[in-house]
């Protein structure tokens, strides 16, 4: 039985049982020697019908015997070549040995069997292979540094931290709430202690309490906070203007005391008796009218409180007389200051130093003129310029209305 017919038979049968476990061991030499006698006996013996199992066993035995006979022939040929190689003095390992031939013979046999093919030569299915591949873990700490290798650990800085902008904003908000609100509250307390700004301070206090205690919309809260800051800025501007005005007035009032001026008797009419009685107070009534009610206010002048404070000339055309309508001492009538020049005013009024500001509208921004008469030195001119400049910085619409008595009384103290 040839090897081709053996393989065809094995492929048809598909090896229902595993060929690895069913192959028998090599038969004994005695059974091989009696091969011829067994063949003769089979010829002489009557023919018997073989079952399917007997045929399988006989085919298996035939394959094993054929393999053994082939190995025996190879062994005999190798011995013959060994003797020939000894005569030729060739290398002993130049021809394949018996074990190598047996290994190749068994390898070729087992690789051609159907069981080996089904077990070790299955085609690769890509779909089943992809199913076994797990999803890789994404690396989130991807470094964009151009330097290769592992970077050394560094402490987080102001620009490297991921939450720098958020934390910085939180710190700024906490700083504003703790420090700015405290500053505004203290400024409002200072405004409440101020006499001319008390009413404005009360309004600022109401806004501050509304911002602090009531839960309002963010935009409205920011609006209130901006108004408070603007009010405080206005308060400081007005306070500075009032301080400059007060300093200028004090310099002006102290100027005659620092100079060696002649006595008041030199300017007095010698025919008038000396009256040592004190001057009447402001609220004293004469002829049914007070000192302020005796004279009318001009239409184009006002003081820094928004009230008209300049006095107009009397009906008879003379200068205002202060104590009695029948006063003997009368001065010459003069024109208003706005309708005459400086030289004419000095010529007609010898006491122009006392009335130089009569009729001047300071609040409307009229610049001060330079009077270079006797007794007007540089310090006086600077003080007067500062006084007129401070009047222009005051907003009359924001000032509370007060009477003349209150105004004059607090400024003198």
UniProtKB/Swiss-Prot annotation:
Sequence ranges of Basic and acidic residues compositional bias: 69-83
Q: Record keywords: Magnesium included?
A: no
Any one GO molecular function term: structural molecule activity
Tagged with keyword Cytoplasm = yes
Any coiled-coil regions, as ranges: none
Where this protein primarily resides, as one coarse class?
cytoplasm
Annotated region described as Disordered, given as residue ranges: 1-87
Assembly and interaction partners = Interacts with itself. Interacts with MPC54, NUD1 and SPO21/MPC70.
Q: What does this protein do?
A: Involved in the pathway that organizes the shaping and sizing of the prospore membrane (PSM) during sporulation. Probable component of a core structural unit of the scaffold that initiates synthesis of the prospore membrane.
Q: Where in the cell is it found?
A: Cytoplasm, Cytoskeleton, Microtubule organizing center, Spindle pole body
Set out the biological process GO terms recorded for this chain's protein: ascospore formation
- Give the transmembrane ranges: none
This protein's name: Sporulation-specific protein 74
Q: Which UniProt keywords apply?
A: Cytoplasm, Cytoskeleton, Sporulation
Instruction: State a GO cellular component annotated for this protein.
Output: cytoplasm
């Amino acid at each position: 039985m040839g090897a081709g017919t053996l393989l065809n038979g094995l492929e048809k049968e598909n090896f229902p049982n595993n060929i690895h476990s069913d192959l028998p061991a090599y038969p004994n030499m005695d059974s091989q020697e009696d091969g011829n006698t067994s063949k003769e006996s089979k010829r002489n013996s009557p023919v018997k019908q073989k079952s399917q199992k007997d045929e399988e066993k006989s085919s298996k035995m035939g394959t094993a015997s054929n393999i053994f006979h082939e190995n025996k022939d190879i062994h005999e040929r190798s011995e013959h070549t060994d003797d020939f190689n000894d005569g030729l003095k060739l290398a002993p390992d130049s021809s394949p040995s018996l074990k190598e031939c047996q290994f190749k013979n068994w390898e070729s046999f087992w690789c051609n069997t159907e069981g080996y093919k089904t077990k070790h030569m299955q085609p690769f299915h890509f779909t089943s292979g992809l199913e076994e591949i797990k999803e890789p873990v994404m690396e989130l700490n991807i470094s964009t540094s151009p330097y290769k290798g592992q970077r050394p650990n560094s402490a987080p800085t102001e620009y490297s931290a991921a939450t720098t902008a958020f934390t910085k904003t939180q710190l700024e908000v906490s700083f504003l709430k703790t420090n700015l609100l405290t500053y505004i509250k203290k400024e409002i307390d200072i405004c409440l202690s101020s006499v001319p700004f008390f009413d404005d301070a009360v309004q600022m206090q109401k806004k501050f309490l509304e911002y602090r205690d009531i839960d309002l919309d963010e935009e409205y809260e920011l609006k209130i906070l901006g108004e408070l800051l603007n009010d405080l800025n206005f308060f400081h501007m007005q306070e500075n203007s009032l301080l400059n005005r007060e300093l200028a007035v004090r310099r002006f009032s102290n100027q005659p005391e620092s100079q060696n001026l002649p006595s008041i008797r030199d300017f007095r009419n010698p025919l008038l008796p000396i009256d040592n009685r004190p001057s009447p107070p402001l609220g004293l009534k004469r002829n049914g009218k007070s000192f302020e009610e005796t004279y009318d206010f001009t239409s184009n002048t006002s003081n820094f409180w928004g009230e008209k404070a300049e006095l107009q000339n009397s009906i008879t055309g003379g200068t205002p007389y202060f104590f009695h309508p029948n006063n003997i001492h009368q001065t010459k009538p003069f024109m208003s200051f706005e309708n005459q020049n400086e030289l004419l005013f000095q010529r007609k009024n010898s006491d122009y130093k006392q009335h130089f500001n009569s009729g001047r509208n300071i609040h409307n921004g009229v610049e001060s003129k330079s009077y270079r008469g006797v007794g007007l030195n540089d310090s006086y001119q600077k003080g007067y310029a500062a006084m007129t400049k401070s009047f222009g910085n005051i907003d009359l619409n924001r000032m509370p209305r007060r009477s003349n008595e209150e105004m004059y009384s607090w400024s003198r103290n």
